[in-house]
Amino acid sequence: MDKRAMLGAIGLAFGLMAWPFGASAKEKSMVWNEQWKTPSFVSGSLLKGEDAPEELVYRYLDQEKNTFQLGGQARERLSLIGKQTDELGHTVMRFEQRYRGIPVYGAVLVAHVNDGELSSLSGTLIPNLDKRTLKTEAAISIQQAEMIAKQDVADAVTKERPAAEEGKPTRLVIYPDGETPRLAYEVNVRFLTPVPGNWIYMIDAADGKVLNKWNQMDEAKPGGGQPVAGTSTVGVGRGVLGDQKYINTTYSSYYGYYYLQDNTRGSGIFTYDGRNRTVLPGSLWADGDNQFFASYDAAAVDAHYYAGVVYDYYKNVHGRLSYDGSNAAIRSTVHYGRGYNNAFWNGSQMVYGDGDGQTFLPFSGGIDVVGHELTHAVTDYTAGLVYQNESGAINEAMSDIFGTLVEFYANRNPDWEIGEDIYTPGIAGDALRSMSDPAKYGDPDHYSKRYTGTQDNGGVHTNSGIINKAAYLLSQGGVHYGVSVTGIGRDKMGKIFYRALVYYLTPTSNFSQLRAACVQAAADLYGSTSQEVNSVKQAFNAVGVY
């Protein structure tokens, strides 16, 4: 099995080119999109005023219409889809580009306003749509588009017609197909058998051609398995690696059982028994004496305990309440399928296979694996990075970074390897990936060595090594390809990448935009002339990302 295909989750790549103008945070710095010849990241003192924050954005874009090339008034081209205040007091807004009322796929703009000053814009907008002759009425129906997608899944993926589950509603979008935007249907095909899949299809609304497709594993829909009413208790059990853990449970006097239901964190943490089937979520895990020492219990003990650790990490370190920021319940299913060699976040819950005992142990036994997958959930609710090409590699890297930081937070034999606790149990020192030395497992550690093929959604598990190495260097320091990097420690590195993920990245961000986002995040947190900003630049220089 290709270990790069493990730990899957959700990528158009928009080529970017950086053009900094001045060193001060108050002077403009731009990252240009090479494909569309428009800015994809602008920071500095962009515009001041007493208008509402969104009005500043519209005014600035109208003022710079020759640069952004939106055509017409900005308020007619952008729809405000999100607005919040971050921990620094900045007003952060997300806008979606529209063409005659139809959303432009992946074209999201993030704007920051602080004390009446527009300080940054991040995201790729598609220019000059008004100059193109774009159809806004489909020649094929929704039903036809869905049938085309399902048939392609059967022909190319499952080799049989999958038992499709309810997915995201099919919708019309303007899809940036290369340099030729066109009207398309976005179709979601979800299924659990014969293998789990959550495919996104772009179907040309004119002729039914498949324009693009990718497997976005983190968006399936579970059902059943209700919480129980009862008293919060503390149980004890043994995990996959044989270590003892105390876990929060719930005793139901009505049923006379203790359940893996933790009522102390957010809306609860629930762990289910899949019973080696592929129906989610399974049965809420029950035990007669609140002691979970049977070998069959081990995967559930770890899934339950580590979900709590991940919740605590995001709450205590980043002030984030669960993966959605609003204390959503965390649900996990263990013993999924038979010998299933994977784990995944499906948009609503965690799913863990038992492994085959040779390539993998039960996946919930790796705390970095649990942190990795739940971070995909955080990404889903923030940047929404498309799981393909460079945006998908950033998605994977974010999960590796925060999975590793969770492991250090819990101080459970922490290191910079990914999946080392559950991968190839018969081979000492083996792992899925390495952040400190990506080349150790065949992954690139420099942009010049990136994978440019189409396998693995454009190398999402491979090219993540480039960003992993940058994060490692930012934390620990070192010399890489002749570039010296001053380390700033894990905590600051995590703060910078978290802020970049939550407040600057957009669905189609690529590596250059990630660099700009991390530089801006470091400037926000530590000052524009700080060592932290310099170290971010050094780390990305060292891996060839500019």
From Swiss-Prot:
Organism: Bacillus caldolyticus
Name this polypeptide is given: Thermolysin
Temperature section of the record: Thermostable.
Cofactor note: Binds 4 Ca(2+) ions per subunit. Binds 1 zinc ion per subunit.
SUPFAM superfamilies for this protein: Metalloproteases ('zincins'), catalytic domain
Keyword Calcium: yes
Encoding gene, per UniProt annotation: npr
Keywords: Calcium, Hydrolase, Metal-binding, Metalloprotease, Protease, Secreted, Signal, Zinc, Zymogen
InterPro entries: FTP_domain (IPR011096), PepSY (IPR025711), Peptidase_M4 (IPR023612), Peptidase_M4/M1_CTD_sf (IPR027268), Peptidase_M4_C_domain (IPR001570), Peptidase_M4_domain (IPR013856), Zinc_Metalloprotease_M4 (IPR050728)
